[in-house]
Every structure is written in structure tokens, then in C-alpha cells.
């Protein structure tokens, strides 16, 4: 004996009403469940995300470089002819847990109305553009405003009011032009006024501290009231980072601003660092595999570690040095736009800086 609704319009109305209600409810529950899953994934990250190994993953890279409008030519290795693809496919796998997956919508919703500023040299540019591409891959049709000025760039995702800023500074401490010439002031950080009022700050410095001769951007270093034609670069780095730490202690309100420091990014100009003394990063197609990187821990890392331990305000140290040392294959090398020579200090995009941002994302939302 069958059941029929023929001739009963009120039944049809309530049937379709409850059907629609169930569909909407299922959608809401699904969205809520997805957000809950992201939260659980982030909250579960109670391990050392910075110790692990690189694994090949066919699902990588996390975005298409041809569809991201923010990549500078010097980082867009595929566009400028890099023939191999394996360097795009490596995912960082921590030893005792899994690194949370990046969710661009979750990031935008959690950071709605906030300002995130990267402060540092061209490696900060590397990381800023990476984060912009990661987010854009989730909302490719959303409206954005990109403004580039000398020393400062900002990218705003309009619908969410999220702004990614980049403040370019080679040393964090001040570099001024005076009567005697260009003076690197190891105990002055007046430019820090530009960093105040941010919701998140991500700092970086080291790359330029080692430059000499014609690529050295200063003529004198100033410490106190004394000028120096030069000094041990590690000593200078320590003095500069100590000045930065004093600025953090004096001006950062942890209830309003989260502070990160992206650690020392290694170079791969010297093949002896990984047991190939005749080579550099050029033509490298695989990461270094081994229990310990032969090049050892950079002294800059030791200095940065010392400075971090003396901070009175909370700063999240993204300790990317060890995992980045393994990626001798991930540099632009000869595929760096119109930049001549062999670039073994910056990184291809997509590439290693995406992992830096996964670590930033994981730390930001689990802290």
C-alpha cells in the first residue's frame, strides 16, 4: 500500500520547506565543521615543527606561479626557464607530528581587519610574496589593492580588510646619509616608528651584514659616539639585534601585537657545505639528504639565539635555518629574471618560503 501526496499542496510546501532547511543546515554544519577541523589541526601542533625532513609530494606546489600576480621576476624561476620541476614538489614533514595545512579562507577570516607587516630585506620580500600567493590561490577572484612605494608596499584583500605590508630595511637599525657618508647606526632604530600599530610583525635580518666592497651599502658603522670604518660583522650583527630587542621590549604591547622573527636564511654558494666542493646551487635538483648538514650551524644563528633568550616581550622565533640548509635545490640560480649571475641566496616561488609561511601560519593560530 503506497503513500501519495496528490491533492495535498500543504504537504508539498512543508516537504520542500524542510528539505531546504535541511540543506541549509547541512551547509552551515559543513562550514562550521571545516573551521573546527582547521582549529583542531592547529591546536594539535604541540611538537617541534622545525625538526624533520623533506618528502616528495605530488600535490605540491601549493599554487600556480603563472596565476599569482605578485611574484617578482627574480623569484619566478619557471617563468625564466628553469627546466626541472622536482624542486616544486617537496613538502616539509616534522618528525613527530604533521604541519597544519594552509587554509587561506581561515587565515582571512581570522585576520579580518588586521595588518600584518614584514620588516626586513629581500628575503622578507620573498616571504611576503609567498604569503600573498598562498592567500590568493584560495580567493583568486577577490578584489585587492596593491600599492608599491619606495621602501614600502601594501596588499589589501578588500572583502576581508586584511593588509599585508612590506617594509624594506636591510639591517633593522638605521642607515643614514650624513656629511661623512653613509652611516650604519648600530644603536639607533628610529625607523621603528613605522612599525608601530601593526597587529602582526615578522622581522628578518642577516643577509646584508656580510656584504663588502662595492655591494656594501654603508661607509661607516656608528656605535655610541664612535665611527668605525669596519668591525667584525658578527659583533656588528649582535649589536644591531640587541638594539632591535630593546625596541621590542620598549614599544611592543603583546596584547595588541604578535611578533615573529624569521630566522637566518642560508646561502648555497659553497658546495663544500654539503660535501660537493666544486659545486654551488646551480644545477642542484634535489635537497640534501643526511642526518646532519655538513656545513654546521651558522654563527649568526648562535647570535640570534642569544638575543632571543634575552627578550622580555614574547617573540616567536621561526627557526627556519636547519630545514632551509637542506634545500640547496630551491634557489633561482641562473633563472632569476634580468638579474645576472648565480643567485644562491634568494628562493624560487613557489618554493621554500611557502614552508616558512606554513610555519608562521601554524604558530600564529596555535599560540
UniProtKB/Swiss-Prot annotation:
Example GO molecular function: O-acetyltransferase activity
One GO cellular component term noted in the UniProt record for this chain: plasmodesma
Q: Which domain of life is it from?
A: Eukaryota
Among the Pfam families in the record, one is PC-Esterase
Q: Where is this motif: DCXHWCLPGXXDXWN motif?
A: 343-357
Q: Which cysteines are joined by disulfide bonds?
A: none
Membrane spanning residue stretches: 7-29
Q: What keywords were assigned to this record?
A: Membrane, Signal-anchor, Transmembrane, Transmembrane helix
State the coiled-coil residue ranges.
Answer: none
Please indicate the residue ranges that the annotation assigns to the motif GDS motif: 120-122
Query: Which family, according to UniProt?
Result: Belongs to the PC-esterase family. TBL subfamily.
What protein does this entry describe? Protein trichome birefringence-like 39
**What's the source species for this entry?**
Arabidopsis thaliana
Amino acid at each position: 500500500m503506497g503513500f501519495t501526496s496528490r491533492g495535498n499542496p500543504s504537504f508539498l510546501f512543508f516537504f520542500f520547506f524542510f528539505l531546504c532547511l535541511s540543506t541549509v543546515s547541512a551547509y552551515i554544519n559543513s562550514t562550521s565543521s571545516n573551521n573546527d577541523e582547521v582549529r583542531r589541526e592547529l591546536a594539535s601542533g604541540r611538537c617541534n615543527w622545525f625538526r624533520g625532513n623533506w618528502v616528495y609530494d605530488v600535490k605540491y606546489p601549493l599554487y600556480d606561479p603563472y596565476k599569482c600576480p605578485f611574484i617578482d621576476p627574480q623569484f619566478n624561476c619557471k617563468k625564466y626557464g628553469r627546466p626541472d620541476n622536482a624542486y616544486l614538489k617537496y613538502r616539509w614533514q616534522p618528525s613527530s607530528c604533521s604541519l597544519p595545512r594552509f587554509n587561506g579562507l581561515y587565515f582571512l577570516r581570522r585576520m579580518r581587519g588586521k595588518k600584518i607587516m614584514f620588516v626586513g630585506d629581500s628575503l622578507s620580500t620573498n616571504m611576503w610574496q609567498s604569503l600573498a600567493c598562498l592567500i590568493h590561490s584560495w580567493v583568486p577572484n577577490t578584489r585587492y589593492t596593491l600599492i608599491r612605494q619606495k621602501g614600502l608596499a601594501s596588499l589589501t584583500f578588500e572583502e576581508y580588510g586584511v593588509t599585508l605590508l612590506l617594509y624594506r630595511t636591510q639591517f633593522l637599525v638605521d642607515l643614514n646619509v650624513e656629511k661623512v657618508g653613509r652611516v650604519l647606526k648600530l644603536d639607533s632604530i628610529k625607523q621603528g616608528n613605522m612599525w608601530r600599530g601593526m597587529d602582526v610583525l615578522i622581522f628578518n635580518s642577516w643577509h646584508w651584514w656580510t656584504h663588502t666592497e662595492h655591494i656594501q651599502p654603508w661607509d661607516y658603522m656608528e656605535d655610541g659616539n664612535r665611527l668605525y670604518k669596519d668591525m667584525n660583522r658578527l659583533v656588528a650583527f649582535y649589536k644591531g639585534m640587541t638594539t632591535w630587542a630593546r625596541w621590542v621590549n620598549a614599544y611592543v604591547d603583546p596584547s595588541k601585537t604578535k611578533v615573529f622573527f624569521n630566522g637566518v636564511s642560508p646561502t648555497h654558494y659553497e658546495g663544500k657545505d654539503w660535501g660537493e666542493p666544486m659545486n654551488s646551487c646551480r644545477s642542484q635538483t634535489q635537497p640534501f639528504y643526511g642526518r646532519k648538514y655538513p656545513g654546521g650551524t651558522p654563527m649568526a644563528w648562535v647570535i640570534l639565539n642569544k638575543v632571543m633568550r634575552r627578550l622580555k616581550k614574547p617573540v616567536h622565533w621561526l627557526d627556519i635555518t636547519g630545514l632551509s640548509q637542506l634545500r640547496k635545490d630551491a634557489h633561482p640560480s641562473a633563472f632569476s629574471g634580468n638579474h645576472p649571475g648565480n643567485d644562491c641566496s634568494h628562493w624560487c616561488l613557489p618554493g621554500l618560503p611557502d614552508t616558512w609561511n606554513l610555519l608562521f601560519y601554524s604558530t600564529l593560530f596555535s599560540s
